[in-house]
């Protein structure tokens, strides 16, 4: 559904066939169409594997399903709360809340769009992890390494590109951007821990460790609210963005450390060193070409080159990941 929404929504935004004045109702209809299409496709696939359907209410089975499902539902609610409560608190706490909430939303919309791509990646990983956890933990650890290198390596490049070119990127979309640059940069810094959550949170979900995930998410909400209460009155949208970055970082570290302990992940410094070298290389390139008109292009090319040089993208490992998913 998300992939369909991204494709149709992106086409509607940038196509020459769309009207000059785009209304919010257009996106409501696009989202409704995507949900309906996904439902119909899912039903068509499901019907092939079922006998003649009939309605029958089994109370005990329904209760069993609810008991098994509610931890997942609670996790989704908690994660959405500590990810999206900042905008609500910003509007309520700050003296100029409506304006600051608008400034925050300018940057958050772009983060949310990238978040959707990450969710697609996590959705692909979940069944792979679930399947392999039943057979071999060693295979799962290889998959975690491959997926982490692939996703987080790309995210490091995205973070450098968006942070260093914040005014340019925001200027493509909005007219008044000066107040939004700082919040946008902190929000994009938070995309790296979000990527970590996609990997390690998905691994824990596939292993059924919902209790620890819900506990971490609950602590994330407490931390997020506390930091927002402290920072928003003085710093407004920037304070809310810092709160988001800090909260995502804390939850990512907690999930990562628990995964190390739970799955006995080897503590090899090489993996972390590769990401540090990638970040250092991109920082050097960004500093040296800071005044260049082609900074973004240089960063992208350099980032991709470094990713391959550091073997963060291993084509054989990716092929193995694809074959494992089948």
Regions found by a protein language model. Name each.
Residues 31, 35, 64, 68-80, ...:
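Residue-level signature of transmembrane alpha-helical cores of multipass secondary-active transporters
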Residues 14-20, 77-114, 131, 167-176:
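Helix-terminus/linker motif at the lipid-water interface of multi-pass membrane proteins
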Residues 1-48, 219-223, 237-258, 302, ...:
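Hydrophobic alpha-helical transmembrane segments
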Residues 17-30, 42-83, 124, 128-142, ...:
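Interhelical loop/hinge segments that connect adjacent transmembrane helices in multipass membrane
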Residues 286-326:
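Membrane-proximal transmembrane or re-entrant/amphipathic helices at the cytosolic face
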Residues 103-217:
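Specific pore-lining/lateral-gate transmembrane helices of multi-pass inner-membrane transport
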Residues 1-12, 184, 194, 200-226, ...:
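Alpha-helical transmembrane segments of multi-pass membrane transporters/permeases
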Residues 24-25, 99-102, 181, 210-211, ...:
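Residues that define the loop-to-transmembrane-helix transition and helix capping
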């Amino acid at each position: 559904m998300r992939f369909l929404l991204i494709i149709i929504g992106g086409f509607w935004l940038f196509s020459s066939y769309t009207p000059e004045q785009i209304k919010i109702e257009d996106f409501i209809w696009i989202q409704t169409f995507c949900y309906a299409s996904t439902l119909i496709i899912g039903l068509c696939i499901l019907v092939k594997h079922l006998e003649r359907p009939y309605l029958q209410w089994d109370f005990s089975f329904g209760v069993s399903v609810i008991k098994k499902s509610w931890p997942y539902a609670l996790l989704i609610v908690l994660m959405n709360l500590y990810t999206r409560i900042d905008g609500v608190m910003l509007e309520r706490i700050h003296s100029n809340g409506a304006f600051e909430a608008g400034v925050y939303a300018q940057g958050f919309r772009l983060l949310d769009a990238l978040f959707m791509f990450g969710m697609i990646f996590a959705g692909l990983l979940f069944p792979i992890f679930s399947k392999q956890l039943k057979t071999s933990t060693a295979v799962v650890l290889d998959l975690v390494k491959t997926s982490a290198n692939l996703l987080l390596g790309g995210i490091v490049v995205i973070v450098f590109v968006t942070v260093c070119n914040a005014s340019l990127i925001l200027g493509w979309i909005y007219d008044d951007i000066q107040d939004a640059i700082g919040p946008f940069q902190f929000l994009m810094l938070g995309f790296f821990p979000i990527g970590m959550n996609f990997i390690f949170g998905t691994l824990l979900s596939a292993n059924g460790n919902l209790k620890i995930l819900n506990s971490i998410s609950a602590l994330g909400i407490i931390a997020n609210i506390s930091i927002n209460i402290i920072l928003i009155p003085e710093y407004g949208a920037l304070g809310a963005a810092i709160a988001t970055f800090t909260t995502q970082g804390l939850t990512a570290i907690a999930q990562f450390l628990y995964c190390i302990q739970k799955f006995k992940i080897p503590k090899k410094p090489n993996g972390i060193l590769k990401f540090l070298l990638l970040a250092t290389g991109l920082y050097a390139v960004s500093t040296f070409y800071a005044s260049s008109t082609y900074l973004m292009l240089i960063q992208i090319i350099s980032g991709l080159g470094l990713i391959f040089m550091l073997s963060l993208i291993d084509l054989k490992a990716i092929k193995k990941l694809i074959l494992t998913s089948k």
